[in-house]
Amino acid sequence: MTAKDLHFYEPKNGHGLKHDPFNAIIAPRPIGWISSWDTNGNINLAPYSFFNAFCYHPPIIGFSSTNWKDSAGNIQETKEFVWNLATMDLAKEMNATAAHVARDVDEFKIAGLTAAPCKLVNVPRVAESPVAFECKLTQIIQLQGADGEKAQAWL
């Protein structure tokens, strides 16, 4: 491969392609299907495409919330959340939970899912999902660009 075969991409200058290469190249991305609830007992279930594992020992996972959303606020309040595996069989239900709804609307009900109790956290998990990680918050970080300017995204 020669230099002329490469496409150089500097985000501030755009890319001239049909689709954003950042999203297309970093794929497939696992979905962080995050269940949480607030201190008033309002349940939230939402998918996040910026999700991954970050450390083996101790096991650490994380997701990025673009703009401050209910999930981030709930987790900051209660210090707990659950990551639920979104399988192909659950894709329709997962997409239904992406709807922008009022804080007191239960996405489990919208998607026809069952909220099941967990063993280590008070947050419910998706009973239909074959895997659920019960998580405790360690930190929330507001992301920033290389120029030091704060982004409207939290990890």
Give the residues covered by each predicted segment.
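Polyanion/phosphate-binding surface patch
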Residues: 48
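Active-site-proximal mixed secondary-structure blocks
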Residues: 1-44, 52-155
